[in-house]
Amino acid sequence: MSMIDSSKFVKATKTAFVFPGQGSQKVGMLAELAEQFSGVKETFAEASEAIGFDLWHIAQSGEGLNQTEFTQPVLLTASIALWRVWLELGGVAPKYLAGHSLGEYGALVAAGSLSLGDAVKLVNLRGKLMQDAVPQGAGAMAAILGLDDAKVVELCQQVTAQENGSVEAANYNAQGQVVIAGATAAVEAVMSLAKENGG
């Protein structure tokens, strides 16, 4: 097990923290860090008490970890646990806080705009609503890399017009990286066309 040496932190004047969105979860995450910092499990206990189920158990066992209603509160709690470890170690206070999708809630908690307890309740509800909106396996998302945004939109329109189900550009992550979302068959069809077009 390796210990964290806070003396190696860069003393930057402009630091930003960007909290991750869904998809960054892994069974057993933060287990090693929890052995070094009691605040990790304390953060999970605080969030678990607010939400009414054991988030640490889900993170460590993987039971339900890929169900959105559980994934989101676990990831939010993990982000805040890491944030608190950073502060405990005397890490530089960031000038900017941001988050990608679900990570926006982590940024709000870190900024003191939202309590962890309220935030885990919100993201649990958010996850339930997302899960209910599309039955398991009926919908999908995928990142298309290496194509112009307009080409991705064109491919989505082409597939949707062929009645393979609806698919749309859902998120423009960066130049040449567009996330698409829609019916599973339609997303797969766009992915296939994207590969044919050099994506």
Residue ranges and their predicted role:
Residues 62-63, 98-102, 127, 139-143:
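Short, glycine/charge-rich beta-strand/loop segments that flank catalytic centers
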Residues 23-24, 49-51, 111-199:
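Alpha/beta catalytic cores of group-transfer enzymes, especially the acyltransferase/condensing modules
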Residues 2-6, 84, 128-129, 165-167:
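A generic local structural motif
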Residues 100-108, 113-114:
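Glycine-rich nucleophile elbow surrounding the catalytic serine of serine-hydrolase chemistry
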Residues 75, 82, 107-109, 121, ...:
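Hydrophobic side chains within alpha-helical segments
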Residues 29, 72, 109-112, 133:
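Short, function-defining helix-loop hinge/capping sites that tune catalysis or transport
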Residues 4-98, 180:
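Helix-rich "cap/lid" substructures immediately adjacent to catalytic or cofactor-binding pockets
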